[in-house]
């Protein structure tokens, strides 16, 4: 009669047997994972900050949002470059849970980590990019696709450089303050804070002498 493995191990030693198992973490790409984690944490923080700013009843100044958006875009570029730098390492890494990992309570996390296909949102983005670009990847060679991508990178770099040069020629914050200062100097038609004095009105009606308005009070001009 065959016996189970558990029955061959004394009950007192079963727990120690599991604890004595040592795992080799030398193959874990710690540097790559930590670099990606830091970049993603920074990007998530910036996106959350933009979301909070846009959720306020009163929006901040436009140049504040633009500054935060520039920071977010630079962090997005940093994430992309980091993923490209460690692409070979991450593509060859196999993810699997350890025996002590709580797979029951974190089933969704395990499913996400072990997922082989793109999530539906990513597939929709990739489909949209293909349709927008008008390039049929199935009919092109890898060299031709790489050439098109290189042309796109060159155009992107040119646009980024041109925008940076033009942006440096203007001081938007000072222009905003100057425009507000000029607007405050404009003459506006407004009602006086206090009505005309009755005596001044009667005097103007009788003699035609126009009263002089100084601030919120009105006094009659003297001959």
UniProtKB/Swiss-Prot annotation:
GO terms for cellular component: core mediator complex; mediator complex; nucleus. Pfam families: Med8 (PF10232). It is found in: Nucleus. Residues 2-138 are annotated as: Interaction with TBP1. It comes from the Eukaryota. GO terms for biological process: negative regulation of transcription by RNA polymerase II; positive regulation of transcription by RNA polymerase II; positive regulation of transcription elongation by RNA polymerase II; positive regulation of transcription initiation by RNA polymerase II; regulation of transcription by RNA polymerase II; RNA polymerase II preinitiation complex assembly. Its main location: nucleus. InterPro entries: Mediatior_Med8_fun/met (IPR019364). Residues 33-59 form a coiled coil. Component of the Mediator complex, a coactivator involved in the regulated transcription of nearly all RNA polymerase II-dependent genes. Mediator functions as a bridge to convey information from gene-specific regulatory proteins to the basal RNA polymerase II transcription machinery. The Mediator complex, having a compact conformation in its free form, is recruited to promoters by direct interactions with regulatory proteins and serves for the assembly of a functional preinitiation complex with RNA polymerase II and the general transcription factors. Belongs to the Mediator complex subunit 8 family. Present with 937 molecules/cell in log phase SD medium. This is Mediator of RNA polymerase II transcription subunit 8. It comes from Saccharomyces cerevisiae (strain ATCC 204508 / S288c) (Baker's yeast). The gene is MED8.
